[in-house]
Amino acid sequence: MLLNKITFFERFEHDILSGAKTITLRDEAESHVITGQILPVSTFETDRWFCDIQIIDVTPVKLTELTEMHAKQENMTLPQLRDVIAEIYPGLEQLFMIRFMILSQ
């Protein structure tokens, strides 16, 4: 079933709105989006809407395959990105990279 919205931790809101964060790495349960799909974006903590995004593409990627390019698209260093992934998805190897662009804020 396709997602009908997506949430991000509040700490990522500024990076998303500024265009510094252009991908999100998710587990399989949160990977059910399709190219061209438009989603409202809310904060995870309070479910406050802050923008709409359009999905550019979805690509499977393993944790061990993450590079500096992925980190840059997340507006982090590679060690920071790996730490965040370990915090959110402990022990998970298979991720899905969702590339997106902001439509409205």
Swiss-Prot record:
Source organism, top-level taxon: Bacteria
Enzyme class: hydrolase
Residues the record marks as active site: K21, T24, E74
UniProt entry tagged with the keyword Cell wall biogenesis/degradation: no
GO molecular function terms noted in the UniProt entry: hydrolase activity, acting on carbon-nitrogen (but not peptide) bonds, in linear amidines; N4-acetylcytidine amidohydrolase activity
Keywords annotated in UniProt: Hydrolase
The EC number(s) this enzyme carries: 3.5.1.135
Domain named ASCH: residues: 7-93
Cellular compartments per GO CC: cytosol
Known catalytic reactions: N(4)-acetylcytidine + H2O = cytidine + acetate + H(+); N(4)-acetyl-2'-deoxycytidine + H2O = 2'-deoxycytidine + acetate + H(+); N(4)-acetylcytosine + H2O = cytosine + acetate + H(+)
Cross-referenced SUPFAM superfamilies: PUA domain-like
Gene3D superfamilies: Hypothetical protein
This protein's record includes keyword Electron transport: no
PANTHER family recorded: UCP029143 FAMILY PROTEIN
Homology family: Belongs to the N(4)-acetylcytidine amidohydrolase family.
Record function comment: Catalyzes the hydrolysis of N(4)-acetylcytidine (ac4C).
Protein known as: N(4)-acetylcytidine amidohydrolase
Native species: Shewanella baltica (strain OS185)
